[in-house]
């Protein structure tokens, strides 16, 4: 069985690079994007992507806007959101049932979220 294909989207180079390294060490195939526009291009070029790990707050296109645009074309794509915001109450109603992981996180916190997102049935 091949490694699940993930798209990691974060405008912070350090966070993205460290997270990608942790995910690769965890057995995942990871494509990195530094913006919503780059993520859309990566998804078009890589139809095998199963899951996006997306930062909420990015310049130009928020993580929520990115997910909305992706789901318009690929409704089966699942998402895990990562955020520096500790209080998630402002998100009520904006993400349906998406999984949220608060930065800073460890692989022990991120891995279960990724596994859960990958194991949920298709939409």
Identify the function of each model-found stretch:
Residues 58:
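Receiver (REC) domain active-site loop signature in two-component systems and cognate sites
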Residues 105-116, 122:
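C-terminal output helix
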Residues 27-34, 42, 78:
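Short hydrophobic/Thr-rich beta-strand motif most characteristic of the beta2 strand and flanking loop
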Residues 10:
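Conserved acidic carboxylate
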Residues 55:
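Active-site residues of response regulator receiver
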Residues 34-38, 62-66:
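Acidic catalytic/metal-coordinating carboxylates
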Residues 13-31, 98, 117:
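Two-component/phosphorelay signaling modules centered on CheY-like receiver
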């Amino acid at each position: 069985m091949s490694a699940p294909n993930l798209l990691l989207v974060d405008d912070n180079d350090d966070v993205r690079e460290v997270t990608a390294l942790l995910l690769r060490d965890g057995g995942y195939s990871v494509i990195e994007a530094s913006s919503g526009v780059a993520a859309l291009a990566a998804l078009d070029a890589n139809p095998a992507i199963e899951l996006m790990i997306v930062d909420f707050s990015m310049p130009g296109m928020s993580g929520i806007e990115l997910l909305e645009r992706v789901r318009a074309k690929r409704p089966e794509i699942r998402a895990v959101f990562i955020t520096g915001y500790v209080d998630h109450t402002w998100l009520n109603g904006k993400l349906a049932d998406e999984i949220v992981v608060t930065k800073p996180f460890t692989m022990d916190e991120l891995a279960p979220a990724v596994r859960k997102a990958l194991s949920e049935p298709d939409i």
